[in-house]
Amino acid sequence: SVQLANPDLVGLNVTIPYKEQVISYLDELDKDAAAIGAVNVIKIVRQKGKTRLIGYNSDVIGFTQSIEPLLEPQHKKALILGTGGASKAIAYGLKKLGLECKFVSRNLREEMLTYDQLTPEIMDEYKVVVNCTPVGMYPRADEYPNIPYQYLTPNHLLYDLLYNPDTTLFMK
């Protein structure tokens, strides 16, 4: 195991696509990670000859602290692009900030919208759009999520979780 091979290891990060799958290997979840259903940080605790793995989700903290100062009175509802582990943390954080959320997926699912269902009325109703997909990430930086950009206004707030490249086409 990793713990035996690296006795000095005290923790590690988890990224897509493993944020949800890793939960079954953990001994404990912090309350936010349990509510979100996704983990991106694992703390390794060694006590009395036993090793315990504890899962946390720091995505929600980083996201809410960075988006909260950008929110204005018209930002009451958010579209969340993607349905993976990161999107769950984003929805959890936005709800804590008082926003109503709707997921957008490529595939038709209950309680979600597809990209084809993003009408002018929906885009007008949901003034915050958060990209939680890998679309537009290096090395495919020439791509962007398939939303109707023509319906965006200066009252919209777009937020991209991707960090490579620094500015994605979604944000331009």
Language-model-detected regions and their locations in the chain:
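Short glycine-/small-residue-rich Rossmann-like dinucleotide-binding loops
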Residues: 17, 133-135, 162-163
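Glycine-rich adenosine-cofactor-binding loop
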Residues: 57-60, 67, 71, 75-95, ...
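NAD(P)-binding Rossmann-fold cofactor-contacting core
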Residues: 96-114
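Rossmann-fold NAD(P)-binding glycine/threonine-rich loop
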Residues: 154-172
